[in-house]
């Protein structure tokens, strides 16, 4: 089991290596791992004979904290899972709680949540595909997209007050309403992203070295991908047409028009192609929404659940009482078992919650998508070259904060 993978475990298992074989540590502190991940790899020359993955270096007991924190407080933990696209985590948790409480939010809230979700998805895919190019020596390609990533971060920072740990959304609505130039700036970002994505796509797909390092590398069949629990772009790259936004719609995803890109062999190349097309589809979704954001309130009228606005708390006794009760006594969720899944940037992010009607959950379990990808890493790289393992790891988009949770 994972917790048994100590130095003694590896010393015992690999003490009688065949002549010419070496044991190599890829991580836990290595640029190619993009986080605190450890892969112990047995190689013969440059060929990988065996590999084992070790997790837990940044385990922070989030599920246990979920049993101590109130439903509002746990939102800060979701920030620190997949920290590349935190609003997607925030929205997933809030939707789970709203499902438990059968809360309906105004349409304005849903529109803004969807726009921010797709902007966050684009950021995540820029990081994943851009860093893959860097790992393979194609540094300049990433720079074509990072300028636009920064523009998206500026929008998110203006809206939420933070770039990474956004703590975006509240039970029943948003933390605050969108700012006056929000629509204009989102449209400008989308306009600039379109040619940048095509240029980046051209830089990689017309590069023989990139194609040689990714085509047919780290592939997985559709059957094995399903068996390992793959979801998201990695599953679709293997040829499986499954996207929570289409197959189990939430928010207003059933009311917008977009396509689901599907790969064939689940290789590094096809994972990259799927993510590039998903960026185009995210822009398509945003453009259908941004001009139609309805007017109206940016939160439901729920004194028992929605934290009141600060200026009202400071000037109105009734609002101060509501604020005190929500902070001190928490939001009371009906007893029962609930599961809510959303399509995060790297796959199906699910929250399983057991409530006993108290201010804190009795049990919280997070279905983090990259946990399942990492279990398959040894199978993907076995028999391949050591250099190819770096590309494979990068294309899986394993985020250490989410993996260990």
From Swiss-Prot:
Broad enzyme group: translocase
Superkingdom, taxonomy of origin: Bacteria
GO molecular function list: NAD binding; NADH:ubiquinone reductase (non-electrogenic) activity; quinone binding
Listed Pfam families: Complex1_49kDa (PF00346)
Catalysed conversion reaction: a quinone + NADH + 5 H(+)(in) = a quinol + NAD(+) + 4 H(+)(out)
Membrane topology recorded in Swiss-Prot or TrEMBL: Peripheral membrane protein
EC number(s) reported in the record: 7.1.1.-
Transmembrane segments: none
Role according to the record: NDH-1 shuttles electrons from NADH, via FMN and iron-sulfur (Fe-S) centers, to quinones in the respiratory chain. The immediate electron acceptor for the enzyme in this species is believed to be ubiquinone. Couples the redox reaction to proton translocation (for every two electrons transferred, four hydrogen ions are translocated across the cytoplasmic membrane), and thus conserves the redox energy in a proton gradient.
Family: Belongs to the complex I 49 kDa subunit family.
The protein's name: NADH-quinone oxidoreductase subunit D
Organism: Leptospira interrogans serogroup Icterohaemorrhagiae serovar Lai (strain 56601)
């Amino acid at each position: 089991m994972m917790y048994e993978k100590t130095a003694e475990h590896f010393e015992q298992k690999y003490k009688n290596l065949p002549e010419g074989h070496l044991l190599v540590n890829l991580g836990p502190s290595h640029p190619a791992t993009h986080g605190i991940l450890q892969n112990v790899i047995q190689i013969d020359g440059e060929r990988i004979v065996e590999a084992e993955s070790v997790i837990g270096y940044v385990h922070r007991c989030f599920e246990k904290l979920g049993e101590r924190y109130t439903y509002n407080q746990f939102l800060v933990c979701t920030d620190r899972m997949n920290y590349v696209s935190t609003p997607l985590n925030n929205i997933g948790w809030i939707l789970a709680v709203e499902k438990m409480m059968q809360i309906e939010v105004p349409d304005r809230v849903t529109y803004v949540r969807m726009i921010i979700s797709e902007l966050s998805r684009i950021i995540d895919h820029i990081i994943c595909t851009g860093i893959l190019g860097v790992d393979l020596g194609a540094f300049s390609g990433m720079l074509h997209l990072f300028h636009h990533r920064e523009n998206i971060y500026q929008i998110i920072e203006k809206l939420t007050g933070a770039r990474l740990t956004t703590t975006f959304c509240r039970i029943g609505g948003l933390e605050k309403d969108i700012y006056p130039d929000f629509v204009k700036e989102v449209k400008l970002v989308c306009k600039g992203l379109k040619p940048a994505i095509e240029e980046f796509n051209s830089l990689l797909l017309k590069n023989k070295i990139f194609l040689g390092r990714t085509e047919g590398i780290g592939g997985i069949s559709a059957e094995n991908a399903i068996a390992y629990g793959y979801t998201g772009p990695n599953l679709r790259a293997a040829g499986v047409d499954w996207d929570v936004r289409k197959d189990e719609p939430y928010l207003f995803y059933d009311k917008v028009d977009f396509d689901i890109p599907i790969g064939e062999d689940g290789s590094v190349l096809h994972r990259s192609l799927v993510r590039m097309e998903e960026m185009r589809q995210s822009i398509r979704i945003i453009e259908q929404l941004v001009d139609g954001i309805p007017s109206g309130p940016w939160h439901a009228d729920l004194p028992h659940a929605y934290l009141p606005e600060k200026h009202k708390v400071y000037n109105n006794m009734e609002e101060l009482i509501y604020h005190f009760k929500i902070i001190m006594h928490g939001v009371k969720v009906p007893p029962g078992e609930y599961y809510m899944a959303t399509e995060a940037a790297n796959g199906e992010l699910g929250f399983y919650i057991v409530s006993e009607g108290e201010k804190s959950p009795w049990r919280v379990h997070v279905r983090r998508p990259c946990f399942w990808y990492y279990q398959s890493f040894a199978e993907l790289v076995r028999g391949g070259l050591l250099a190819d393992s770096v590309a494979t790891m990068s294309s899986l988009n394993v985020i250490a904060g989410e993996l260990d949770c």
